[in-house]
Swiss-Prot record:
EC numbers for this chain: 6.1.1.5
Annotated binding of L-isoleucyl-5'-AMP, by residue: 562
Keyword Nucleotide-binding: yes
Keyword Cell membrane in record: no
The protein's name: Isoleucine--tRNA ligase
Family: Belongs to the class-I aminoacyl-tRNA synthetase family. IleS type 1 subfamily.
Organism expressing this protein natively: Microcystis aeruginosa (strain NIES-843 / IAM M-2473)
Highest rank taxon of the organism: Bacteria
Substrates-to-products reaction catalysed: tRNA(Ile) + L-isoleucine + ATP = L-isoleucyl-tRNA(Ile) + AMP + diphosphate
Subunit text: Monomer.
Length: 952
């Protein structure tokens, strides 16, 4: 056969310059440059036909490098924005940064030499903090752009911008004028390590905090009920506390009026008052017998007096709230109005003074008597416990592990301490806030319960901070009376100054310049307050400074999207300020995501060595073999693959799987591109009604798949998109349609109906695949679009709009029929595989398939698909092509199957595999009895002979 012709050049093999390898670290930046040069985002944001869609960015903190949590957050936002752009909305995304606050101030202070710290004025410190925040913002901005995130990067919002600070003062002013801002001496979370008040959102509760808890006896001096009189003078009330250092601030004991309390004998003629329900438990704790001598209702004990064991003062037993329970302790609660929220409320009700003998550093003041100078978090507990022991008042000391608030930045414990602070009176607008929560769509729905309970139960919001790097509270104090001056006129004047000069003006200008003219010579002398605002008030004002201020945006925003910790952070501060100022929520929809953990579900930490750096995923690590450069599309694909409503996992194994999936999608697209290299939809497309049945079935699948993809994006369930697209590329395209269609594409005449009909479906599948993956695999989608071998009216995939699905493609009847055919194919493949494994056949084309189908209607359907003459009919809808075999025979008797060496059966078909009849065709590799019958081409079959003449 040495003279045999070569038919290699007559076969239509796929041709494309689209690279098999992603080469993402090089290709992605090229695509990003194309987007930037062509202003794709800007044009769509301006020219799209539908209304505005505003996802308002929660500002990341301008401190430190980007981590995988940033990537999750920003990419989720970008997926939604790009989907909305493809849907035709005018999407305007303004990225923001949170630039004030303690963490930046601490970073700056840590970076200074001791010589630089001397003479460091607030103005100099603020300048350094400003420069640090801007530098970090620039670095983070470049990182976000490399993630492929689209937005107005040239005009971001920064909370340190003068116009932002002025808008923040406007929010504060509106709240103040409505009576929602007040100054008060109240217990707040105080951080001795940072020497400032903290908001709830600035606290964390690490595992494993252990306190020295004590049970203490306070001797009773006078009784409110005669039932107690017989036990005097040896009667005491027992309390329990996990913070012995707060005992110098004790001014009451609180009880629950509904509970029963008993007098118990502890030893001969010594008695304690405790909750009746706890007697047994306390007997174990004290390791002694407690005998009940009398029992009274809590209400009857009100106004019973006791003497403080360490200070010469009398206090009373008072009625507390439902926080007094029998879950722990004694059922009677030590109450220090200067050291606790509930204590403060009880104290206010009974007119108690607010005693808080602790200074900014956490040291006892002279009011603490013998304990003055001791630090409450270090040596005070030991000294107080010793003093209680000496007085015979200590009943028991034991270690107690519980959740305790720490400063989120210094990682050191905080205390409750009463100080003069500025507050937002949440009580004044709580009901309005709860109504506003009801008007919002929460995703997942559990977010609504979370923020509702937080807002329902929260205390007033302490908004003042004793630090330099922030927006000052625009208040003046009368030098003589210390009365605060806060009027519409003073607020507006400061706001106008900040709008031009920024908040630095507060430190740089004199009081006279900061005051409006009418207050400059009114016979009073003023000083300016030096407190700054809580940074949550900064970011919580962004709805006014950005969404409401920029003409291209809108308020309320369509969506806020952040981590689930923001229910107590930005979601809440934004809600409270917007409701207080305007009576409405600042957002219509709130979507929350969980935190990123490693593959074992552990938090990431340097000590565990399990930190996944997005930069390393994109560009590769030092050792590129161990940590190859995957590009950002792999991170974006990961974001779409996880159920973000819970905490999510990432690690090397997960990334490798995602790279495989990205490559499968890429290679599927590459094959489709190559197969369309000579196709022009305008000239060559086949009308739907003329398509072979398998092609119409494939369009039905395309319609099903992409309808599901749209539903996934609409409901923000991106994991459904991920699963659907992955399944479509592998199961529907690669393993089924592409597999079957190769014969049509390769060996038919280039212009034949048989080939053009298939290319018609390929083009539809490819264009819709590119559009569907564009919100997620943005770079791959654009790469595909740029390599389309035919012209489209669209420069970018993002200009082409969302999926193009014709309702006519949906054909349930056809789908049911082909579902059976695909099942049949699976059964045939099982038997083929056995024959292949036994080396009885090599390729499936070496086989002839025997089918016995007992169901008559199915048998009839199959007969229509088993044309004995391959040159008649539509030359596509045939069983031999479905099974990739050379021949198929429908047998009327199962015995024909039973004699076959390779066979199998299911509940609806029996399959036999035998050797194909005839010779192998040199061109298409099918076996045919016609090979050798054509004088000019003796080594090819009748199909190839016809194809070379342009007839097949």
């Amino acid at each position: 056969m040495s003279n045999a012709k070569s038919y290699k050049d007559t076969v239509n093999l796929p041709q494309t310059d689209f690279d098999m390898r992603a080469n993402a670290s090089k290709r992605e930046p090229e695509i990003q440059k194309f987007w930037q040069d062509e202003q794709i985002y800007e044009k769509l944001a301006q020219n799209n036909p539908k209304e505005l869609f505003i996802l308002h960015d929660g500002p990341p903190y301008a401190n430190g490098s980007l981590h995988i949590g940033h990537a999750l957050n920003k990419i989720l936002k970008d997926i939604i924005n790009k989907y909305k752009l493809l849907q035709g909305y005018k999407v305007r995304y303004v990225p923001g940064w949170d630039c004030h606050g303690l963490p930046i101030e601490l970073k700056v202070l840590q970076s200074l030499k001791s010589s630089e710290k001397e003479g460091l004025t607030p103005v100099k410190l603020r300048q350094k903090a400003h420069d640090f925040a801007l530098q970090t913002q620039k670095e983070q901005c470049e990182g976000f752009k490399r993630y492929g995130v689209w937005g107005d990067w040239e005009n971001p919002y920064l909370t340190l911008q003068p116009e932002y600070e002025a808008a923040q003062i406007a929010v504060f002013g509106k709240m103040a004028l409505k009576g929602y801002i007040y100054r008060g001496l109240k217990p707040v979370h105080w951080s001795p390590s940072s020497q400032t008040a903290l908001a709830e959102a600035e606290l964390e509760y690490p595992e494993g905090h252990t306190s020295r808890s004590v049970y203490v006896a306070f001797p009773i001096t006078s009784v409110s009920t005669p039932v107690l009189r017989p036990f005097l003078p040896n009667l005491s009330v027992a309390i329990w506390t996990t913070t012995p250092w707060t005992l110098p601030g004790n001014l009451a004991v609180a009880l629950n009026p509904e509970l029963n309390y008993s007098v118990v004998e502890t030893s001969e003629s010594n008695y304690l008052i405790v909750a009746t329900d706890l007697v047994e438990k306390l007997a174990d704790t004290f390791n002694r017998t407690l005998t009940i001598k009398a029992t009274v209702k809590g209400l009857e004990l009100e106004h019973t007096k006791y003497r403080h064991p360490l200070f010469d003062r009398e206090s009373a037993i008072l009625i507390g709230g439902d926080y007094v329970t029998t879950d722990s302790g004694t059922g009677l609660v030590h109450t220090a109005p200067g050291h606790g929220q509930e204590d403060y409320i009880v104290g206010q009700r009974y007119g108690l003074p607010i005693l808080s003998p602790v200074d900014d550093k956490g040291n006892f003041t002279a009011e603490a008597g013998q304990f003055a100078g001791l630090n409450v978090l270090k040596d005070a507990n030991e000294a107080i416990i010793l003093a209680l022991t000496e007085k015979g008042a200590l009943l028991k000391e034991e270690a107690y592990q519980h959740k305790y608030p720490y400063d989120w930045r210094t990682k050191k414990p905080t205390i409750f301490r009463a100080t003069e602070q500025w507050f937002a009176s949440v009580e004044g607008f709580r009901e309005l806030a709860l109504e506003a929560i009801d008007s919002v769509r929460w995703i997942p729905a559990t977010g609504k319960n979370r923020i509702t309970s937080m807002v329902s139960e929260r205390s007033d919001w302490c908004i003042s901070r004793q630090r330099s790097w922030g927006v000052p509270i625009p208040v003046f104090y009368d030098e003589e009376t210390n009365e605060p001056l806060l009027t519409e006129e003073t607020i507006n004047h400061v706001q106008a100054i900040f709008g031009v000069k920024g908040s630095n003006a507060w430190w740089e200008l004199s009081v006279e310049e900061l005051l409006p003219p009418s207050y400059r010579n009114n016979g009073r002398s003023y000083r300016k307050g030096m407190d700054t605002m809580d940074v949550w008030f900064d970011s919580g004002s962004s709805w006014n400074a950005v969404a409401n201020a920029r003409p291209e945006l809108s308020y309320p925003a369509d969506m806020y999207l952040e981590g689930s910790d923001q229910h107590r952070g930005w979601f809440q501060s934004s809600l409270l300020t917007s409701v207080a100022a305007n009576g409405i929520a600042p957002y219509k929809t709130v979507l929350t995501h969980g935190f990123v953990l490693d593959e074992q579900g552990r938090k990431m930490s340097k000590s565990l060595g399990n930190v996944i750096d997005p930069n390393v995923i994109i560009n590769g690590g030092k050792d590129q073999k161990k940590e190859p450069a995957y590009g950002v599309d792999v991170i974006r694909l990961w974001v779409s693959s996880v159920d973000y409503t819970n905490d999510v996992n990432i690690g090397q194994n997960i990334l490798k799987q995602l790279v495989d999936i990205r490559n499968k999608i890429r290679n599927t697209a590459r094959f489709l591109l190559g197969s369309l290299n000579d196709f022009d939809p305008v000239k060559d497309a086949v009308a739907y009604e003329d398509l072979p049945e398998i092609d119409r079935y494939m369009l039905h699948r395309i319609s099903e798949v992409f309808t599901e993809v749209t539903a996934a994006f609409e409901s923000f369930q991106f994991f459904r998109f991920f699963q659907t697209v992955q399944n479509f590329c592998v199961v529907d395209l690669s393993n089924f349609y592409i597999d079957i269609a190769k014969d049509r594409l390769y060996i038919s005449d280039p212009n034949s109906f048989r080939r053009r009909s298939c290319q018609t479906v390929y083009a539809i599948a490819l264009e819709n695949l590119a559009k569907a993956i564009a919100p997620v695999l943005s770079h791959l989608a654009e790469d595909i679009w740029q390599f389309l071998p035919y012209k489209t009216p669209y420069l970018s995939v993002f200009e082409s709009g969302w999926l193009n699905i014709d309702p006519a493609w949906n054909n349930r009847e056809l789908a049911d029929k082909w579902a059976k055919f695909r099942q049949l194919r699976t059964e045939v493949n099982k038997v083929m595989e056995t024959a292949r494994n036994d080396k009885a056949i090599g390729a499936s084309l070496e086989a002839k398939v025997l089918l016995y189908v007992p169901d008559e209607s199915l048998q009839q359907e199959l007969e229509l698909f088993n044309n004995c003459d391959s040159l008649t009919g539509n030359k596509v809808d045939e069983l031999r092509y479905l099974f990739l075999s050379s021949q198929v025979e429908l047998v009327s008797d199962i015995s024909a199957i039973q004699t076959a060496e390779y066979k199998g059966e299911s509940d609806f078909v029996s399959v036999g595999i035998v050797k194909a009849e005839g010779e192998k065709c040199d061109r298409c590799w099918n076996y045919s009895t016609q090979v050798g019958k054509f004088a000019d081409d003796p080594t090819i079959c009748e199909r190839c002979n016809a194809a070379l003449k342009g007839e097949f």
